[in-house]
Structure formats: structure tokens, C-alpha cells
A protein has these predicted regions:
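Short, surface-exposed, charged amphipathic helix/loop patches that serve as local interaction elements
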Residues: 1-70
Length: 70
């Protein structure tokens, strides 16, 4: 689990992805849509909530995801 603090002060908790999470998004061709779906699932947020994030906050979540996968 990782806690990520967003620019507005909100703290988001992201769990480590499992293979089943990766399988769920495997059929999504667009890379950005795939990342949004994965982040929404791992952070227990809706895709609309992810869409409403600032670019900086999205990047923070994406970097946390990449840390899990590397």
C-alpha cells in the first residue's frame, strides 16, 4: 500500500496491483484509458474522479503505480 498526497491535501491510498488487475485492463487498447482504469481500481476511485485530477496529481499516481511494477 502506498499513500499519495494530492495537491489539494487529499491523501489517496493505492494498493499493490495483482496479476488479475493487469488482466482486467489488458483488453483496453488505449494506453491512457488503460492507466486510468487501473488507477481507479487500485485507488478505489471512479474513472471520473481520475479524469478530474490535475495533470500533476495524475502523474503522482502514475509514478506510484510504476514503482509497484518495477
Amino acid at each position: 500500500m502506498k499513500k499519495i498526497k494530492l495537491n489539494n491535501g487529499t491523501e489517496v491510498t493505492m494498493r499493490e496491483p495483482k496479476v488479475r488487475d493487469m488482466r482486467l485492463v489488458n483488453g483496453i487498447e488505449n494506453e491512457l484509458d488503460r492507466e486510468i482504469s487501473m488507477l481507479a481500481n487500485l485507488c478505489e476511485m471512479s474513472e471520473d474522479e481520475i479524469d478530474d485530477l490535475s495533470g500533476k496529481d495524475f502523474k503522482k499516481l502514475d509514478e506510484a503505480l510504476q514503482d509497484f511494477l518495477s
